[in-house]
Amino acid sequence: MHFLKKSIFLVLFLGLVSLSICEKEKREDQNEEEVDENEEESEEKRGLMSVLGHAVGNVLGGLFKPKS
């Protein structure tokens, strides 16, 4: 009977450990995906701001250009 209790505890313990490891990896994967999405969004914003900056610069440059 004592051997059976130890076996059951061992199986339950190993099951909980493996479940814990799987959950941890799943959370890490989700965090990596969120970081990747945030990086893509920030790159899009930087690209948009760069394009807008050039457009505004061209417009202002055209307005203040000395007329010949």
Swiss-Prot record:
Subcellular location: Secreted
Top-level taxon of the source organism: Eukaryota
Tissues in which the protein is found: Expressed by the granular skin glands.
Signal peptide from the UniProt entry: 1-22
Role description: Antimicrobial peptide with activity against both Gram-positive and Gram-negative bacteria. Antibacterial activities have been tested against Bacillus cereus (MIC=12.5 ug/ml), Escherichia coli (MIC=50 ug/ml), Leuconostoc mesenteroides (MIC=25 ug/ml), Micrococcus luteus (MIC=1.5 ug/ml), Pastewella haemolytica (MIC=0.8 ug/ml), Staphylococcus aureus (MIC<l00 ug/ml), Streptococcus faecalis (MIC<150 ug/ml) and Streptococcus uberis (MIC=50 ug/ml). Strongly inhibits the formation of NO by neuronal nitric oxide synthase (nNOS) at micromolar concentrations.
Extra remark: Forms an amphipathic alpha-helix over residues 47-60 while the C-terminal eight residues are more flexible and less structured. The flexible region may be responsible for the lack of antimicrobial activity.
Protein's name in the database: Frenatin-3
